[in-house]
Amino acid sequence: MKEIVLAGGCFWGVEEYISRIQGIVKTKVGYANGTKENPSYEEVCSGVTRHAEACYIKYDESIISLEELLNKFWSIIDPTVLNKQGNDRGTQYRTGIFYLDEKDLNLIIKSKSQEKKNYRKPIVTEVEPLKCFYEAEEYHQKYLKKNPGGYCHIHLD
C-alpha cells in the first residue's frame, strides 16, 4: 500500500471524489503542512495556522498507479489559482501534493510538468514532503456521504 496527501480546495469534495476511485483503500480529511499542532477547523479557517485542507489517501498501487491518481487529481482542480478553488478562498484552499515517500517525487514532478502544458498561466500547486497532517474533526470525515446534498465545488456526477 502507498500513501499520499492531496490538497484541492475544500476537503469534502476531494475526499468524496477520491474515495470513488477503484484501488483507494482509505481516505481521511485533515490539515496539512501548517505551523500549529492539532489545529481546530476554526483556527485553520482563520488562516493563521497556514494549514491546507487536505485528503490523506492510502491506495493499492497494483490497482491504481500514482500517475493515474495524479491525473485524476489534476482533473478536479485549477492548479493555476493560488488560495482558491471554486467559491472557496483562503490559504487553506491552496492546492498541494504532499508526499510521504521520497521515491514518489520524480513522478510527481513529471506529472506536474505534463500538466503545465495544459495552461498558459503557471501552475502554483505546491509539491512538498508531508511535514504534518492532523486529522480533521469527525463531522468532516466522509462529509458528503453523510450529507449528500452538501456543498461541493467539484462536479461529482
Swiss-Prot record:
GO terms assigned for molecular function: L-methionine-(S)-S-oxide reductase activity; peptide-methionine (S)-S-oxide reductase activity
Organism superkingdom: Bacteria
Keyword Oxidoreductase assigned: yes
GO cellular component, one term: cytoplasm
Catalytic reaction list: L-methionyl-[protein] + [thioredoxin]-disulfide + H2O = L-methionyl-(S)-S-oxide-[protein] + [thioredoxin]-dithiol; [thioredoxin]-disulfide + L-methionine + H2O = L-methionine (S)-S-oxide + [thioredoxin]-dithiol
Entry keyword annotation includes Methyltransferase: no
Keywords: Oxidoreductase
EC number of this enzyme: 1.8.4.11
A biological process term (GO) from this entry: protein modification process
Active-site residues (renumbered): 10
Protein's job: Has an important function as a repair enzyme for proteins that have been inactivated by oxidation. Catalyzes the reversible oxidation-reduction of methionine sulfoxide in proteins to methionine.
Protein family (similarity comment): Belongs to the MsrA Met sulfoxide reductase family.
NCBIfam families registered for this protein in UniProt: msrA
Protein name per UniProt: Peptide methionine sulfoxide reductase MsrA
